[in-house]
Each structure stands twice: as C-alpha cells, then as structure tokens.
Amino acid sequence: MAECRPKNYPKLKDYKPSRFMLPSCHYDAAKADRAVTFIENLRHTKGKWAGKRFWLLPWQEQIIRDVFGIVDEKGNRQFRTAYVEIGKKNGKSELAAAVALYLLFADNEPSAEVYGAAADRQQASIVFDVAHQMVQMTPALLKRCKICLLYTSPSPRDRG
C-alpha cells in the first residue's frame, strides 16, 4: 500500500513559475511532476525523519518545479545551474542528494554523471553518504546500480 502524505504536512498549493522564466520558455507540468514524484519516493536518512518518505515542503517543491519544469521549445531545461541558499539544519544535504539521484537515475540522460563540489573531502562526502543511504533504502534504485566505495569515508558512523 502506498504511503500517503500526512494530512497536516504542508503542500505547495498554487505553483507559479519563477519570475526569471524567459519569454521563449514555458512550464511543463509533466516534467516537473516527474522530478517531484521521484524525490517524494525517496526516504530521509537523518534525524526524526529518518526512514520516512521525503515529502517536499512547499519551498522545496517550488525549487524543483522551477529547475525541472521550465523548459524551452525543444524541452531543454532553462536553468542548468541553480544557486540555493539554505540555513543550517534545514535539509540541504537531503535535498542535494535527492536532486543528484534524480539527475543520475531519472533525467533520461544516457550515462549520466553527477558531480559534487566542496571545500574538502569530508564536506563532499556528506551529500554522497546521504545519496548512498537513500539508494540503500530504495529497492528500485538499488537494483539499477552498484555502489563502489573507493575511499574511506570520514563520516562519524563509519568510525566504529
């Protein structure tokens, strides 16, 4: 049985495309819905939400719909880069990992490659570790990939 969004959990009610949408572009609801649905089928990996469905908050869904749903006449995304500034403890790593997994698994790009950048290896490993855990908790994704850890993770849970 499908897990339903909790009744008291906020949902984006009236999506309005970004004010930065070019006149030559349009909003493709199907493309945006695909990204939202993919992400909302992942699981949180940390804190009180660990193991629960990744129901997007309205501000998160607005970002996803803008980035993946605004396209040109050929269907290419208008936004190839997005700068998103989020305060501490507001799910940056979870959202970044979810977007990276969408780009890797569901964006219809053959041999897709997704890169993460950070000031150092420990910081870069945070999003990778979250994405790795999300894949481990999603049987459909786990069947489609093999994760090879080629470095010693500096994350605290791996220190024993």
Question: Model segments located where?
Answer:
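Phosphate/NTP-binding elements of NTP-utilizing enzymes
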Residues: 1-153, 157-160
